[in-house]
Amino acid sequence: MNKKDRVLAAISHQQVDHVPASFSLHFPREIASGEAAVKAHIDFYRETDCDVLKIMNENLVPEIGEMNGPDDWKKIPAYNRHSPFMVRQLDMIKHILDGVGEPVYALATVHGICASAIHPIEERYGYVPVREMMAAHLRQNKTVVLDAFHRIADAMSDLAAACIEAGSSGIYYAALGGEKHFYTDEEFAEAIEPFDRQILSAAREAGGHTFLHICKENLEMSRYAGYGDLCDVVNWGVYEAPYTLEEGRRLYPRATIMGGLANRSGVLVDGTDDELKAAVQAVIRDFGETGFILGADCTLPTEIPYGRIMAAVHAAVK
C-alpha cells in the first residue's frame, strides 16, 4: 500500500496496513515562498516520511491599509484565482507536485473565512486586536462587514476549486471563529458558518476531499456539528480546545479523525524516542486504526528536528 492509497483508505474507513500520518509546520520566512518553498515542502515530505504532503499557504489576502471603522471593510476588493497572490500559491502547488515525482496525497491549505478576513489588517494591528476589531465592527455595521465576507468567501471558494484542479487531492481548511470569547453562537451561525460551508462545498464540487481544521482554544465545538456533511476529515486542538478524540468521533461519526498529539509541548516536542513511540501506539490502540490519521493539534514548531516527526510517523507502523 503506497502512501496515497493508505490515506485514501483511511478517509474511506477501509482497512489500512498501518495508520497514516500527517504533520506540518510553517517554514522559516526565507524559504516560505517561491522556489525555496517548493524545495522546502519536498524536503519535508521526504525527510519526515509523512503520508500526507500538506502544502502551506503564506500567500495571503493582501494588506489594505488602516481600518478606522466598519466602512473600511469596503476597501477589500473582489479576488479570484487570477489575482497575483493566488497565482503564486497555485504555481507553487503545481511545482511541488511536479517535483515529488510519485503518487502523493497532497493537501492544499485554504484559510477559512475568519482567517482570510483578518489577513488584510493583521500585520498592521496584531492578531488579538484584529480579532476583537472584526467582532466589534460586525456588531456596529453588520451589512458592510458581511458584504466584505461575501467577497472574500467567493475568492476562497475559487481558490479551493483551483487547488483541486492544480492537482491537490483535497484542501486543509483552517477554520477560526469557534472561540467562545470572540463570537456568540448566533454571530457564528450568521457571520462564519455560511461562508465556511460555501468554501468547503466549492472544494467538494471540484472533486476534492475536505479536511476541516478547527483552530485555537476555548472552542465551542458544537458550532461545527453541522459541518459533518461537508468534511471528510476533521482535526482540532485536542489539548487546546479541549475536546477529546472520542468526543470528536461522536460529533463526527462519518468523518475520519486526525490528531492525537499535542503540537507545541508533550512527547512529540519534549519526550524521548521511546516515550514518543509509546504515546503514538497508545493513541492508536485506544482510538483504533480505522478512520484515523495520526497528527497533531496544529502546526509544529518551525525549529523541530525532522527526525522527531519521522519517529512519530514510524511509530504508527505495525
Annotate each language-model stretch with its function.
Residues 1-31, 35, 40, 51, ...:
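Active-site loop segments of alpha/beta catalytic cores
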Residues 58-76:
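A short glycine/small-residue-enriched secondary-structure motif
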